[in-house]
């Protein structure tokens, strides 16, 4: 997709299609009151459901050595409760994947100088993540088609109310939504090939932070790529157009950029000479711009250029 072309580097993960029908369940426990339950049910070629629950009390001991004291303490408010469930269904070229995650965790207070200076353990964090995605992939001779539709919903609640330092008081809730759609097509004509893709993403951010104004973003990307392969020579050229616009109180300037990529390699015998050039444009995310403490509305887009030349030698004489 165009979003994949836009990344400086990409790791491709594809959900495994079950090759057998099975049902498994497990229970584990460990130190510091840790308990874990997990279960997986899969049906050959059709889909699976996987769930896990984890609970730990934390409260683990630790050694503390400074010029003021040498002692052992116990880390309080370090509990974690987590639940995750996800499922995936397959039918011909269609794949539907749904995921849900919920967690509550404590955030231990920091130590200033002495163990007795430990901040009161009041920090807490609540997370909830959900997404549902439908993917279509099919080939018709030399023509390949791919489509993706995805909806994501994320919630974060962070609270820290240290009586020792009221200046770091925080009790914020963030809610983000993301709707994403992508379509891509590829055509192979002998030694030549063409591919085109376009992505459209709508995302928003709401929070109860004082003086925060609702913001949503429209992000579109379009890419066109051509490649040639013959007698050990491989060449790929591509262009990507990105347009990002934020809509909130006041005015924001849209961001647009055209970037280019080129890759070439030549193989003769055990030797391969390869090189590539890639320019990358990345707009700050809504988190980068609008989150409390870590957000900075004055952030500028990132521009990256990558260039690489390498030689590879392969031989069957070495294991």
Language-model regions: role of each:
Residues 120-139, 252-319:
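Outer-membrane beta-barrel signature, preferentially recognizing the C-terminal barrel domain
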Residues 39-43, 85-91, 132-138, 181-187, ...:
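Residues on the lipid-exposed face of transmembrane beta-strands in outer-membrane beta-barrel proteins
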Residues 21-25, 45-51, 87, 92-98, ...:
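Transmembrane beta-strands of outer-membrane beta-barrel proteins
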């Amino acid at each position: 997709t165009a979003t994949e072309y836009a990344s400086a580097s990409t790791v491709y993960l594809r959900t495994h299609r079950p090759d057998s029908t099975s049902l498994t369940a497990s229970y584990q426990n460990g130190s510091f009151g840790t308990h874990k339950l997990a279960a997986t049910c899969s049906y050959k070629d059709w889909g699976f459901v996987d769930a896990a629950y984890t609970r730990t009390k934390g409260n683990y001991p630790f050694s503390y050595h400074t010029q003021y004291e040498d002692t052992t303490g116990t880390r309080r408010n370090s509990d974690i409760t987590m639940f995750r469930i996800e499922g995936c269904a397959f039918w011909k070229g269609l794949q539907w994947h749904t995921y849900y995650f919920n967690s509550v965790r404590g955030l231990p207070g920091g130590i200033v100088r002495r163990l007795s200076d430990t901040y009161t353990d009041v920090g807490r964090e609540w997370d909830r993540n959900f997404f549902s995605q439908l993917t279509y992939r099919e080939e018709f001779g030399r023509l390949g088609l791919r489509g993706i539709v995805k909806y994501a919903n994320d919630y974060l609640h962070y609270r820290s109310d240290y009586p020792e330092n009221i200046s770091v008081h925080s009790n914020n809730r963030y809610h983000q939504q993301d709707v994403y759609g992508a379509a891509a097509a590829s055509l192979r004509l002998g030694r030549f090939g063409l591919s085109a893709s376009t992505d459209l993403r709508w995302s928003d951010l709401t929070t109860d932070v004082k003086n925060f104004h609702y913001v949503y973003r429209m992000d579109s990307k379009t890419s066109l790529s051509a490649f040639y392969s013959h007698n050990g020579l491989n060449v790929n050229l591509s262009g990507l157009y990105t347009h990002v616009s934020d809509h909130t109180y006041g005015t924001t300037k849209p961001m647009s950029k055209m970037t280019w990529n080129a890759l070439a390699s030549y193989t003769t015998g055990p030797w391969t000479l390869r090189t590539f050039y890639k320019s990358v444009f990345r707009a700050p995310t809504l988190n980068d711009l609008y989150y409390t403490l870590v957000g900075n509305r004055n952030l500028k887009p990132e521009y990256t250029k990558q260039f690489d030349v390498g030689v590879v030698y392969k031989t069957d004489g070495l294991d």
